[in-house]
């Protein structure tokens, strides 16, 4: 007997299949057995010999009942109830790590986060300048109102049973908002408003992707929207630091590529029976190539790199085939060589990489040298919010925010922020094995992976471990488009938790 362990199960000859059938007449990825609210279904995935249900060839999804016979190649499989399977299941990483120990109460976690943000407020009130001492307190009040308002809506209106993921996001968001109060009070409030809008996006996206089957119908409109956003940026975008990635409408500005990240994750994931068809894979490859190409044309190579690495992660999760990854990397190397030849300012960044102390007075090393210097002066506990010198350097609140946090709040807090982002990836990895659909599993892991890639480029770029690419620190860097995008991406991780839709208070 072969156990069926997941909501969506691939059946085939491949060792990577959820149900492996040792039969040469069976295709490597032959069909998918999936569970929905109204029962179980089988769907052929472009196999050579097709899939038969009770002697009849299936077309699309076919409902499977107990004792029905599924025939693939020369093998027949009969559906039985789970209690009839008597063999012990082998322990794995997926199952052995699940704990019944209750988590900390959500309201207690929120209190800890609020206290931390309040301590930041007090520290900012007693800065060296000594002026406008009450501004941080007013901002903290507004921040606390947004955070607790979001908590009460989630807990008592939507009636969700868990709030751990949102707490991590609120912790990071609040730090980003409070760090801005001694740089630009207006920017701090803009960031807070953008975060509140992002929380609304979070709720909308979770509702939008509630049914993984209906989501597939939105793929084409979403593709058109993403390509349209990037195309409009090429035409109307204003060139800033060599990249035309901002659109200005009066005093309002936004970065369409940040919103395109959400769509990119959305397009990359599908339910398993759709995912394993050649048409779906080809569509995604073409869409990814167009997005990365448009980003390269506008000169936003940092975001292009994030998209490409996310594509690699998605492609591997979809196929488990290293050959696909190797071919994609080879194509990327060719593309990078082409870019370096025709975009000399990009090559200049590489020439300054690992040599910032030789370029402390020019664009190749000025920012990184200051980050390293002021991080050292901040030590473990920092010099206090508003008392640092890095805030006088361009992009200190966005591209260099890791250095700013290290100087003003200490390396311990800065490292904690990086760990918090990494914890989102661990959370996503842990919950996806129990997701209701491969759509949720892939989108959650890829969204969390995107955060980790973005974090790495930001932290290591600012500290000269990698070339400075100008990408933001998730949730913490200043930027309305960035914070809204981050909250939108968190929705994919939240949706992968089966408790989000199946359990209410």
What are these regions (language model features)?
Residues 1, 75-120, 124-134, 285-288:
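Regulatory inter-domain linker segments that are low-complexity and enriched
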Residues 2-75:
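Forkhead-associated
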Residues 142-146, 196-201, 407-426:
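Hydrophobic alpha-helical transmembrane segments
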Residues 161-169, 186-194, 205-229, 247, ...:
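Interfacial loop-to-transmembrane-helix boundary motif in multi-pass membrane proteins
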Residues 240, 244-246, 253, 326-417, ...:
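Hydrophobic, glycine- and aromatic-enriched re-entrant/interface helices and adjoining loop segments
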Residues 278-297, 301-341:
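Hydrophobic alpha-helical segments of polytopic membrane proteins
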Residues 431-470, 476:
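Loop-to-helix entry and N-terminal half of a specific, functionally important transmembrane alpha helix
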Residues 456-505:
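A juxtamembrane structural motif centered on a specific transmembrane helix
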